Amino acid sequence: MSLFTAINKMAGKYDMPILYSCHPRSRKRLEQSGFILDKRVIQHEPLGFHDYNCLQMNAFAVVSDSGTLPEESSFFTSVGHPFPAICIRTSTERPEALDKACFFIAGIDEKSLLQAVDTAVTMNQNGDYGIPVPDYIEENVSTKVVKIIQSYVGIVNKMVWRKF
């Protein structure tokens, strides 16, 4: 329940609505626990990709366990819509985004999460948005992929499929 306690504390500290995209299993667990969310916390069905990205662009901060948060944060920074991005995880598949300071890994405990949100919001307010990850803003990705795949067809056929 420390995550929900942290959400309530964020609502109180920043005195603004918090949209909690709540998976049905999480909603059920929350109801069974009897935990009461702050009145500023709005429980919502999971959002589609477009709606979620529109919300991110206009958010005070984004706190999420989504594995795509690093890419989204980097992309929106590159197009002039940076937002404080805080990931509720203990590791990431995208260390390159962490290296460019596009997002924070907050951990999963209340104290670390609240500290990460405070730091991310303050840095964002001071104009410190991190740097977009160069690999995420490549313009000709499909061309590169086609050329790479085509370049390895002969090797894969020979080494994997034993076609000579």
Regions found by a protein language model. Name each.
Residues 1-16, 21, 26-164:
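Nucleotide-activated sugar donor-binding and catalytic core shared by glycosyltransferases
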